[in-house]
């Protein structure tokens, strides 16, 4: 099968993709439930405030996963939910004096703008929690019927999952029930055990009537953990391939999801995938700690492609330290900016030499494929990318158009997997870009280079140098090769 992501012809009979499974704490060979198809659910954002780099790292990681699986020949279905009803949304909207649904919708739009700004493609399905209340109520009813949930006896309308009724509780996180802290999601007085968590929350007098729905237990709203089990089941079925999110969701959120789904008789996810945090001064980037870097602010200083590179270049299970002072350490946004500049410089130089549109390669290098098949080994894959760029620059310098075309084709295929190809549709709407300008600028520069070549031919060195200086002052690098002069952005 040939994917439209990069053109790489991955044969499913030879795919050896390996993935770290959080549930088993080991690397496993990935085997999808349905041949040729992959189903992925990753937990979306609770739209209470602006998205920061910690949120958007997850979006980038799963976007790269999707691209690589498609590149390998799979048809991929991705579901990412939007939690648009939650305690924090109600509290923050009340403090701001805005309707809770308007508050949620505003920040949902900010989330969409953030992942679009960083070149992430939208999920196949992006369901809102509030649009799936009937499915959630049915799941709660099933759990009550099976003896794994109970309505609170205090008349609050709350319904809890009985953790003691499910012996496998704790299998994902490895935490024993007796070692767990009490669940903090509702009033403990209605619980059989402090660790029981809320499936359904009864309506409270100080909450808007519109933030509640009719249920067999009275008006109320779903608990956070319930939402994902119901929505993943609706769009992917009772069993699907990969469930993911940030590592902080492993417990209690994903543990609770797994327990309530399995207790209801659903096989649920076969692989669990978690990305590490973005940290600041060694601490997890978090709204509660007040140490966040909003995507909209960071992209005012750094190009969106540099920010995306910053988030994908380290391995997804490694922490990324964000330093607002950018002290020049490897992995900083300054280093990411230099990397993007090096990539773009090669693309410009190679395209100028080849003189025609070059498509992505249909066969990626072995080093790149091996790296990506090994649990999305982006650090090694990035190294393979820059190895191609180094060799490609050598070909440009000696004017070898055929070798340059080969390296350019490889680089474009790799950039497509990373979502970093500047000519890809997802970057077409980036602020300040206009594809119509590129041929105009290229034509003007080449006209000046032709005038310079004519001046050099008649030994008019003053004119030739003046043209070169003009182009250099405009931020261009001029390189004389046996095939003629070529330009690139400095």
UniProtKB/Swiss-Prot annotation:
**Motif 'KMSKS' region at which residues?**
284-288
Q: Which terms under GO biological process does the entry name?
A: cysteinyl-tRNA aminoacylation
The top of its lineage is: Bacteria, Bacillati, Actinomycetota, Actinomycetes, Propionibacteriales
Entry's EC annotation:
6.1.1.16
Chain ranges for the short sequence motif 'HIGH' region as given in the UniProt record: 45-55
Q: Which GO terms describe its cellular component?
A: cytosol
Q: What is this protein called?
A: Cysteine--tRNA ligase
Task: State where Zn(2+) binds.
Answer: 43, 228, 253, 257
Where in or outside the cell is it found?
Cytoplasm
